């Protein structure tokens, strides 16, 4: 993890100080198309695994629409989807036990969101909230950080956010390391460190101090419908962000073809290095296209 963090931090510094995006514009032309395909593949995989009935599908569609067209709060979409599916599954029991159906992480995120603080603390807390809400891995962090850093705080543009994802896709580290890039652009070196710390802190603290409690929640039949609903909301959120990413990264017929081809390869092949090869391949092809055709 440390090598990936240091690489991302170094590239983030170059991105800002050496205007890397301008110098590597031809490379990013294809890389961004690959990012759209990568996130789209995550949506398909999550949906095929967790959307198992019509109500869950409807909740995913609702989460997609609310996020894309109404800019609804990430947390409210997830809580709403969870409560809606709980009501659908166990309406009468829910009325009698409503207070037991609010997972601590979601409540904590709502409280954290109400605090007015300095920039450094904001960066850390946005990372912490993203870490607390990592349903489904790194891909769930993408819509949350996109909403927080681009739409709410305006630390980055959509294009810069996608650049960060593209860089993260080629590093020898989990994709979630792109959060270091977001933090650096938001607040410099300290911002990169604080965002990364916030993201990864729950992953270290929860297993050590809250493992038994979290396992109990996951295995509790009363809570399971809520968590299934939350997962459906996550699918909708990531789908909405996929559309936003593609809207920014697919700028012509060539990038559209690259995105479709990248999605097809990612969907069919599941090797450990597939993502790296696809992202680098799209970057190289895009650079050639920019130099010769576009």
Name these PLM-found stretches:
Residues 1-171, 175-294:
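Multi-pass membrane proteins that catalyze or facilitate reactions on polyprenyl-/lipid-phosphate substrates
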């Amino acid at each position: 993890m440390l090598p990936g963090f240091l690489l991302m931090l170094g590239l983030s510094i170059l991105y800002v100080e050496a205007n890397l995006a301008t110098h590597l514009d031809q490379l990013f032309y294809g890389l961004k198309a690959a990012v759209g395909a990568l996130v789209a593949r995550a949506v398909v995989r999550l949906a095929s695994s967790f959307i198992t009935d019509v109500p869950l599908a409807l909740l995913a569609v609702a989460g997609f629409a609310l996020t894309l067209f109404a800019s609804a709060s990430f947390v409210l979409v997830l809580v709403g989807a969870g409560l809606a599916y709980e009501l659908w599954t166990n309406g009468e029991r829910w009325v009698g036990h409503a207070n037991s159906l609010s997972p601590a992480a979601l409540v904590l995120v709502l409280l954290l969101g109400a605090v007015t603080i300095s920039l450094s603390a904001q960066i850390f807390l946005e990372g912490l909230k993203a870490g607390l809400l990592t349903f489904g891995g790194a891909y769930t962090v993408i819509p949350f950080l996109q909403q927080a850093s681009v739409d709410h705080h305006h630390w980055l543009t959509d294009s810069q956010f996608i650049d960060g994802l593209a860089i993260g896709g080629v590093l020898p580290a989990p994709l979630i390391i792109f959060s270091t890039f977001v933090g650096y652009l938001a607040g410099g070196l300290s911002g990169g460190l604080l965002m990364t710390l916030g993201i990864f802190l729950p992953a270290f603290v929860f297993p050590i101090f809250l493992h038994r409690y979290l396992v109990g929640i996951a295995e509790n039949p009363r809570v399971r419908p809520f968590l299934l609903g939350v997962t459906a909301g996550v699918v909708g959120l990531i789908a909405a962000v996929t559309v936003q990413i593609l809207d920014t990264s697919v700028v012509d017929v060539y990038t559209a073809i690259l995105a479709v081809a990248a999605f097809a390869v990612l969907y069919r092949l599941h090797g450990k290095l597939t993502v790296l090869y696809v992202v680098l391949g799209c970057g190289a092809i895009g650079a050639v296209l920019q130099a010769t055709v576009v």
